[in-house]
Each structure stands twice: as C-alpha cells, then as structure tokens.
Amino acid sequence: MLKTQEISINVGPQHPSTHGVFRIILKLDGETIVDAEPVVGYLHRGIEKLAEDRTYTQVIPYTDRMDYLGAMSYNLGYVQAIEKLMGIEVPERAEFIRVIATELSRIASHHVFLASMSLDMGSYTGWMYPFRDRELVLELLEMLTGSRMTFSFMRIGGVADDLPEGFIEKAKEYLPKILDGVDEEEGLLAGNEIFLARTKGLAPVSVEKALAWGWGGVNLRASGYKFDLRKNRPYSVYDRFEFDIPTGANGDCWDRFYLRLAEIRQSVKIIEQALEMIPEGPIMAKVPKVIKPPVGEVYHEVEAPKGILGYYVVSDGSTKPYRMHVRRPSFINIGMLKELLIGTKLADFITIFASIDVVLGDVDC
C-alpha cells in the first residue's frame, strides 16, 4: 500500500494573489486541500479605538481606509449613522449627489475585482479591460471630490461639494462607454472555455450556508437569494430609482464573478436616473459646527460593494464617540474561506479566494 504524507505550505503574507498582507497555511494531501488556517491582522490599525479619541467629523477620513476600493460607501454608512442618532434631515440634492458618488465608487470597486480575478487566473487581457474602464470612473470621482481613492467626501448633514460645472455632461458621455466596456469584458470571458471550466461548479455555496455565514451583497445573491439593502430596506433616495437585483443560481465562482459584471450595469442605470432627477437646492443641512449627538446608540447598515456594511456607534453626549464598531463585509466573507477550500485542489485556491472579493484593509480594521 502506497503511503502518503500530508504537507503544509505557507501562502503569504507577501503573495500577489492575496491582494494585501494576508497569510494562509494550507495542508495538502497530494494536490487536495484538507485543511486551511487563515491568519489575519497584518494590516490592523485600530481604527475603532482611534475613533474614540477623534471628534465625529475627524472620524470620516478613517472610514476611507477600510475598504479603500469602495470608500464612498464607508463614508456614507458612517455619516448616516450619526445623522440617524441626531435626527438630521439631509437636503434632497445632497442625497442625490451621495447616490451618484457611491454608485461610481461601487463600479470602480467591481472593476478592480474583475481585473484581479482575471489576472489571478492568467488572463492578462481580462485585467487590462476593466482597468481601462475604471479610469473613466476615477476621472469622474476626481472631478467630483478631488481624489481618486480615499475621498472623505461625505459630511454629517450632506456632502463636501456640489457637482462641479460640466460633471453631468461628462458623466453622460462616459456612462455609455462604461457599459460598452462591460459588454467587452463579458464577451472576453463568458465564452472562454478555460475560464468557464475553472469557475463553474467550483466552491458552490447554498443559500442556507450563505445566510448562516452572515454573507451579504453579491456573494449572497450569487447563491440565489434576492436581497439588496438598496431595494429591500432603501436608505438615502434609493427608493426613487428603478433597478434590478441580479442573482445567481449555484453560488459558485462563476456566479460570484458574473454578478459583479451585472451589478455594474445596474449602477450605471441608477446614476443615469439620478443625473436626470437631481433637484436644485442646498447640499448641507443646518448642523452645529461642533457635533455632539445626544446620549444613545445607533446601528446603521448600507449596501457596500463587498457586502453589508454596518456601523454601531455609542454616544455619551460628548464630541467624540464613546464606542464605534464596524461590521466589515470582507471580514465576514473571509471567515468562511476554510470551509470553501477543504476538498478543493491547490490550483483552485487562488480562484476561490479571488471570487469572494476581500480587501485586507477591510478585514483588518
């Protein structure tokens, strides 16, 4: 009888496929993964603790530094939590600008996912196309906020700036190009036999498991569960827009990949409606210069690019949060990586890890 020996290999913390400082120890029986031990914490900066020694307004830039690829949603979730605590009513124009900015940020985040997963699987062309189109999105975000990634654009009570002159015209010019790019990216990979063979049926997740794991966002919808906070529990002015919730059937790597393509189309649809419907008016509510919420606590969730993002804030009546906790979707997503990997092949590890879409700044808050 042939004797075999299990071996352990170390992936990361410096490895191109981990997209940041993440380490995982894989135990192999031949080419089959029999155990996996994720090791996180390399990028921990103590943002929740730092918030306790910052004013409510000073916390805003820290929210950018969690999921820095989809930072606008993190700005939005935080300021909406404080607005809920203080009972602030945000002007309509500011809400429309928030939606436009947040959806642009979502598109940019999904483009990074599409590019990274393609490159991880060996498709260099599949990396180039999304980054080409992401550049159009970043140009619009830079025009609006002055920054390409970490924006600090939201304010408690509104937004930092109004839409600049020429923004609406440029957005209307670029959005059809972004849709054309999505069609190209789909055509490049959706009919590629190698790509399909390496993603379809790989690491499927049932609806029951996804819900038990606390998954949200695209990863949950890939399993066939039609739930999107923007539609099911609308916040801001999302209830004004017509858009669909794309869902998958098998919850496998292919569904998780394809749904992000589909989501870009829906985000473009939302932005186009917002540009047509945006009213005139102020961009900031009348709020005190020094933010001092009443004693109390609040929890608020938004639909971030990587899943459901939640802020829990406790106020003791002072100018600084007594406690802040962030429910970070990347941390939730990565928690089930071990179960996804066991029984799969070593060659599929990178594909599976890429498909759940994590960013390490969001894992290690």
From Swiss-Prot:
Keywords of this entry: Cell membrane, Membrane, NAD, Quinone, Translocase, Transport
Reactions catalysed according to its record: a quinone + NADH + 5 H(+)(in) = a quinol + NAD(+) + 4 H(+)(out)
Signal peptide positions on this chain: none
E.C. number(s) listed in UniProt: 7.1.1.-
Annotated GO CC locations: plasma membrane
Protein's membrane topology: Peripheral membrane protein
Enzyme class: translocase
Location within or outside the cell: Cell membrane
Annotated Pfam families: Complex1_49kDa
Job of this protein: NDH-1 shuttles electrons from NADH, via FMN and iron-sulfur (Fe-S) centers, to quinones in the respiratory chain. The immediate electron acceptor for the enzyme in this species is believed to be a menaquinone. Couples the redox reaction to proton translocation (for every two electrons transferred, four hydrogen ions are translocated across the cytoplasmic membrane), and thus conserves the redox energy in a proton gradient.
Protein family per UniProt: Belongs to the complex I 49 kDa subunit family.
NCBIfam families, sorted: PRK06075.1 (NF004739), PRK12322.1 (NF008974)
Subunit (UniProt): NDH-1 is composed of 14 different subunits. Subunits NuoB, C, D, E, F, and G constitute the peripheral sector of the complex.
Protein name listed in UniProt: NADH-quinone oxidoreductase subunit D
